[in-house]
């Protein structure tokens, strides 16, 4: 997220949060060679310009992902990513471009770069093959619906083609967009809606994300048609068929309390949203064992303004 580094739960929910994150911790750490663990993480201007890098590496090494997608590797090139990826035991790495707001992929297994694509994107996407999968890491621009839809259409076309070819695909990243499956709880995020509405109203009508005071969902709707499955939401719905608002906030991926306007749990609660996703083609989704947004330990409140997303699959 860039245009608004804009919750957690109310203070009477600490036990619920602890239990939820404890379950995720064991699901995400008890993997062996028969499983594949995937991490997506927007690291906020290269770990807050390096200030949170050591804490980030320490946390990643507790999770032990097999594949990791990264956004906001600001100023990093591929050589730097390859060097630093050894800190979390990933000997293979690829980056979208030579600098700027970069996108990266690191892996325990060799990476074949299929495409580094920027045309028609503000940032772009990195398409690679690793661990027998097509892995696409993206970062969508939050400025307006038309630009985002152009980016979404390109991702839709790419995944549709790969799916028809029989490829298993992971599309992950910071989408700066919301899923229609989150509408019920997003409609209640009034502080967030109020914060965004004034800026959104200044855009041309066709570029507005908020209509009649509520978020719309054209971007993720288009991407999910590819077809792709939102594995975090799927696993959440199985566990919580009739979720409360507080339970829904457990899958929010942004913002952490590192940002000034959400310094407390009480303030943060009204601004939580889910804009970071791990999406997969149907056959791979069937092999998903667990998926969620890591909201603990507390160090995640200081590493980035985003929370990481993790999914585990049967190999």
Q: Model-derived features: where do they sit?
A:
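Short, Asp-centered acidic motifs that coordinate Mg2+ and/or phosphate
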Residues: 36, 67, 168-170, 277
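Active-site-proximal beta-strand elements of phosphoester/diester hydrolases
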Residues: 35-45, 132-142, 172
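Active-site neighborhood of phospho(di)ester-bond hydrolases with catalytic His/Asp-centered motifs
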Residues: 68-71, 170-174, 230-233
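His/acidic metal-ligating clusters that form di-metal
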Residues: 149-175, 216
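Structured beta-strand-rich core segments of catalytic domains in phosphoester-bond hydrolases
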Residues: 70-150, 292-293
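Catalytic metal-binding/acid-base residues of hydrolase active sites
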Residues: 44, 74, 141, 175-178, ...
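Metal-dependent phosphoester-hydrolase catalytic domains
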Residues: 116-117, 161-162, 181-315
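N-terminal, active-site-proximal structural segment of metallo-dependent hydrolase catalytic domains
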Residues: 4-5, 11, 15-17, 22, ...
């Amino acid at each position: 997220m860039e245009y608004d580094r804009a919750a957690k739960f109310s203070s009477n929910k600490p036990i619920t949060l602890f239990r939820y994150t404890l379950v995720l911790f064991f699901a995400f750490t008890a993997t062996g060679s028969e499983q594949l663990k995937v991490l997506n993480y927007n690291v906020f201007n290269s770990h807050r310009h390096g200030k949170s890098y050591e804490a980030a590496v320490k946390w990643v090494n507790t999770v032990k992902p097999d594949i990791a997608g990264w956004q906001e590797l600001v100023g990093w090139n591929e050589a730097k990513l390859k060097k630093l990826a050894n800190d979390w035991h990933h000997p293979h790495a690829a980056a979208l471009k030579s600098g700027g707001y970069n996108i990266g992929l690191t892996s325990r297994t060799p990476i074949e770069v299929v495409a580094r694509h920027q045309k028609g994107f503000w940032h772009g996407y990195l398409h690679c093959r690793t661990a027998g999968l097509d892995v696409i890491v993206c970062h969508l621009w939050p400025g307006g619906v038309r630009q985002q839809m152009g980016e979404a259409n390109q991702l839709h076309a790419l995944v549709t083609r790969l799916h028809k070819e029989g490829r298993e695909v992971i599309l992950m990243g910071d989408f700066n967009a919301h899923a229609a499956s989150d509408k019920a709880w997003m409609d209640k995020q009034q502080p967030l809606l109020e914060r965004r509405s004034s800026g959104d109203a200044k855009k041309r009508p066709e570029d507005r994300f908020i209509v009649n005071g509520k978020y719309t969902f054209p971007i993720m709707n288009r991407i999910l048609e590819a077809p792709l499955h939102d594995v975090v939401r799927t696993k959440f719905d199985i566990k919580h068929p009739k979720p409360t608002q507080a339970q829904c906030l457990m899958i929010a991926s942004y913002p952490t309390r590192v940002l000034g306007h959400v310094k407390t749990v009480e303030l943060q609660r009204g601004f939580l949203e889910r804009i970071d996703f791990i999406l997969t083609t149907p056959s791979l989704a069937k092999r998903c064992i667990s998926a969620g947004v890591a909201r603990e330990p507390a160090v995640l409140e200081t590493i980035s303004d985003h929370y990481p997303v993790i999914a585990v699959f049967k190999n």
